[in-house]
From Swiss-Prot:
Coiled coil: none annotated. Its EC number is 2.1.1.-. PANTHER family: 23S RRNA METHYLTRANSFERASE, RADICAL SAM CORE DOMAIN-CONTAINING PROTEIN. Its main location: cytoplasm. GO terms for cellular component: cytoplasm. This is Probable RNA methyltransferase Lcho_2507. NCBIfam families: PRK14464.1. GO terms for molecular function: 4 iron, 4 sulfur cluster binding; metal ion binding; RNA methyltransferase activity.
Length: 347
């Protein structure tokens, strides 16, 4: 379901634009309706009031909590059931953040990701994306939404941008706290600067080598990492938001000295931060995370070379909070490790 469908349904009952906006604000922000200025009886026409119970029931059915798995780090992994019975994952993050899904499945096929193993099943509508935020807000405060769950937002651009515009206005989330995460797609760099709400941009880089990136992200657009960084830098300068480059650390694959040199070459002097996240190990996949000590040494080396680097723990590591693990692990066939020449670890 798209947000515009909700508006059309309200208009069909005689709601004016001011009524639509107040109803949608109450829903998106999870505002109380008993007492105060938000009581529907005080501002809605009778026909709209009569239609509200059915509408609210349908909105509640857009995203229902099937299971919740708290993590020791303050995160919580949510398995969310959509109205048609399909499931996606959301992750409540420490410090008032939420990671939402934009597709059921994913077509990019990252070799280290569970979600991509089942392919793309369907798009998640803009109202379903917002419904994940509403579901989370009923449990805790949400001030930041990252579009970094199941799916590639660039492959569902209309719904994702509609949800971003809605959350950045009616949903009362600061524009810099809406983070569009992508593997990189020319359409993203064309579309994001045009919207009324311009989100922060996170770019899944993972390697500076075009050949290796093609192996790790086999169905991502064939854009050279240098071209990706150039386009992202233009967006960063236009919006005054630094680009968040995402780097999943895979032991023996993208954690060697050659990548250090590549990162310095691409990112030195750029308006950016490099987020290095040790791989959230999946039992069914043949990849491992480097030790925390090795990852920290890598981050320190990059700091010394002038790259703003943050080493992060993957949220929900103890509850398998990585993208698609809960939903996809029993559906996917066994994986085969790609043949990549190992590189020496940093001294």
């Amino acid at each position: 379901m798209r947000i515009d469908f909700i508006r059309q349904r309200l208009r069909a009952q005689g709601a004016k634009p001011c009524h639509e906006q107040r109803i949608l604000r109450i829903w998106a922000q999870v505002l109380p309706t008993e007492g105060g200025r938000s009581r529907p009886d005080d501002f809605l026409p009778q026909a709209v009031r009569d239609a509200m119970p059915a509408l609210l029931a349908d909105l509640d059915g857009l995203a229902r909590l099937r299971s919740q798995h708290p993590g020791e780090d303050g995160s919580a992994r949510l398995l969310v059931e959509l109205a048609d019975g399909q499931t996606v994952e959301s992750v409540l993050l420490p410090r008032d953040g939420l990671c939402v899904s934009t597709q059921v499945g994913c077509a990019v096929g990252c070799v280290f990701c569970m979600t991509g193993r089942e392919g793309l099943l369907r798009q998640v509508g803009s109202a379903e994306i917002v419904a994940q935020v509403v579901l989370a807000r009923r449990q805790r405060l949400v001030k930041k939404v990252v579009f970094m769950g199941m799916g590639e937002p660039a492959h569902n651009l209309d719904n994702v941008m509609e949800a971003i515009d809605f959350l950045g206005t009616t949903g009362a989330i600061g524009h810099k706290n809406l983070v569009f995460s992508t593997v990189g797609d020319p359409r993203v760099f064309e579309r994001l600067p045009l919207g009324p709400v311009k989100p922060a941009l996170a770019l899944s880089l993972h390697t500076t080598r075009a050949d290796l990136r093609a192996q790790l992200l086999p169905r991502a657009p064939r854009m050279d990492p240098a071209d990706l960084v150039e386009r992202a830098e233009a967006y960063a300068r236009a919006t005054s938001y630094p680009i968040q480059y995402q780097w999943t650390l895979l032991e023996g694959i993208n954690d060697g000295p050659d990548e250090v040199e590549g990162i310095v070459r691409l990112l030195h002097g750029k308006y950016a931060v490099l987020n290095m996240i040790p791989y959230n190990t999946v039992p069914d996949l043949p990849y491992t995370r480097p030790s925390w000590e090795a990852a920290a040494a890598l981050a320190r080396t990059l700091h010394r070379r002038g790259i703003l680097t943050k080493l992060r723990q993957s949220a929900g590591q103890d509850v398998e909070g990585g993208c698609g693990q809960l939903r996809a692990r029993e559906l996917a066939p066994s994986a085969r490790r790609i043949e990549i020449r190992p590189v020496a670890s940093l001294p």
